[in-house]
């Protein structure tokens, strides 16, 4: 694989660091940008179905695959996120299905409130239209903010369950909690 390392000289956080990469990819003519946490394990060929799904509808701004916890007591079928839900009245957001055993209950494609930045495939044209991730969110909630901006501009945010990854939650940030987050 061809890898480009970009030295920023300081810790820009999840948001700022990803924005540096996003700008680089946009300058290189990327059609899609994938944000992928470094504490994830991907299934073989997980990306192709996501791209094909995005190709099916130009109004899709971003998509998440099904995301499992890496390992819960030896089980690898415990859901970490099946897209995101947000309640603006309560100023709360959470990952759909979090902590539930996957028995097929989240196997339908659907529109969601937000797509988590853990594994977020974004359409480049939408980034150009609505902007980068908001850097006042050093880490966390930048994905929710970006998703809401995309939706406010007429785009949709989708969950696509027919491909998946595993997330070793908090390993890179030492954050163990994440069931419910204030926005």
Regions found by a protein language model. Name each.
Residues 8-28:
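Glycine-rich, basic loop-to-helix element that forms the pyrophosphate-binding segment
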Residues 12, 40-41, 137:
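Acidic metal-phosphate-binding loop of nucleotide-sugar-dependent transferases
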Residues 7, 16-19, 46-132, 136, ...:
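Acidic/His-rich active-site region of diverse nucleotide-sugar glycosyltransferases
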Residues 29-41:
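Short beta-strand-to-loop acidic/aromatic patch adjacent to the donor-nucleotide binding site
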Residues 140:
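Active-site-adjacent helical/loop segments in soluble small-molecule enzymes
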Residues 8, 35, 62-66, 160, ...:
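Short glycine/serine/threonine-enriched helix-capping/active-site loop
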Residues 148, 152-183:
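Active-site-adjacent helix/loop segment of glycosyltransferases
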Residues 30, 57-60, 155:
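Short, high-confidence coil segments that cap the C-terminus of an alpha-helix
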């Amino acid at each position: 694989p061809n890898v480009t390392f970009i030295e920023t000289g300081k810790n820009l956080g999840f948001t700022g660091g990803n924005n540096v990469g996003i700008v680089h990819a946009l300058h290189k003519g990327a059609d899609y940008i994938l944000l992928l946490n470094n504490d994830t394990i991907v299934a073989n060929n997980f990306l192709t179905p996501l791209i094909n799904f995005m190709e099916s509808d130009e109004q899709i701004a971003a998509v998440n695959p099904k995301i499992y916890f890496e390992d819960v007591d030896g089980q690898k079928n415990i859901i970490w996120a099946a897209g995101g839900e947000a309640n603006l009245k309560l100023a709360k957001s959470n990952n759909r299905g979090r902590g539930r055993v996957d028995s097929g209950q989240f196997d339908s494609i659907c529109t969601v409130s937000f797509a988590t930045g853990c594994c977020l495939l974004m359409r480049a044209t939408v980034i150009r239209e609505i902007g980068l991730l908001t850097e006042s969110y050093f880490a966390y909630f930048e994905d929710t903010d970006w998703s809401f901006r995309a939706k406010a501009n007429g785009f949709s945010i989708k969950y696509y369950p027919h491909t998946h990854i595993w997330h070793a939650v908090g390993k890179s940030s030492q954050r163990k909690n994440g069931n419910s987050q204030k926005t």
